[in-house]
Amino acid sequence: MLLCIDTGNTNTVFSVWDGEKFVGLWRISTDHRRTADEYFVWLSTLISLQKLELNIDACIISSTAPRVVFNLRVLCNRYFDTRPLVVGKPDCLLPVAPRVDFGTVVGPDRLVNTWGAFERHGPDLIVVDFGTATTFDVVDTDGAYVGGVIAPGVNLSLEALHMGAASLPHVDVTMPAKVIGTNTVACIQSGIFWGYIGLVQGVVDKIRLERGRPMKVIATGGLAPLFDQGFDLFDAIEDDLTMHGLRLIHDYNKEMGNG
């Protein structure tokens, strides 16, 4: 079985695959102080509660939080007796290399999402990921990542507004009943919701114009469904896009005799 691990700035997600069959997914908050032993106890407990067997013989990691990777490597080495692939490291091969400026480091999650989306939806894509940052990734005709856009994430924007303006409360984002708010909470919710609708529409339109061709828009991330309420922003929403991409990259490395 394959263990896929995706570490973001907010959450770390684990999934297990038996070949191409998805077995399960579990999520924990990202904490660089968490040890390999703690990860194992947590993961093995959840897996046993679902009456699954922990027969892991391969691991792959994608991480935007470098301080966490060390303990995840130890987890894979100590408890599963395997050397994990780490996306973005020289020993982890990619099916198609990104085409960006020399010296540019592309977030591994963006590379993983690019290939996962290409495998499912074909060429000429814009992948919108609603994470800690809201990212737009452009996928070329051969599946290569060719650049994109990074904007503050929804929750990050809410937190910044609350922290930067003492009189403004922290609110949950939701689709407001109308654009013009008649109280502070409604005004903030409207600004965030309609602001991000406009952000997505505007950036997608400009990417399509710059590329000069039709492009499908694939959304992922926990907040993606919030912005898919009759606005025709997305051609598809993929909840498990990163995990799917990690499995594909692992399988590619295996085919190439690497891992």
Curated annotation (Swiss-Prot):
Any one GO MF annotation of this record: pantothenate kinase activity
List the catalytic residues. Answer: 109
One GO cellular component assignment for this chain's record is:
cytoplasm
Q: How does it assemble?
A: Homodimer.
Q: Where in the cell is it found?
A: Cytoplasm
Reading the lineage from the top rank, the first entry is Bacteria
Reactions catalysed, as given in the entry: (R)-pantothenate + ATP = (R)-4'-phosphopantothenate + ADP + H(+)
- Keyword Cytoplasm applies: yes
What does the entry list as the binding residues for ATP? 6-13, 132
PANTHER family associated with the record:
TYPE III PANTOTHENATE KINASE
- Tell me, in one coarse class, where this protein mainly resides: cytoplasm
Cofactor(s) this protein requires? NH4(+); K(+)
* EC category: transferase
Q: How is the cofactor bound?
A: A monovalent cation. Ammonium or potassium.
- Residues annotated to bind substrate: 107-110, 184
- Function recorded in the entry: Catalyzes the phosphorylation of pantothenate (Pan), the first step in CoA biosynthesis.
**EC number of the protein:** 2.7.1.33
Pathway assignment: Cofactor biosynthesis; coenzyme A biosynthesis; CoA from (R)-pantothenate: step 1/5
Record GO biological process: coenzyme A biosynthetic process
The name of this protein is Type III pantothenate kinase
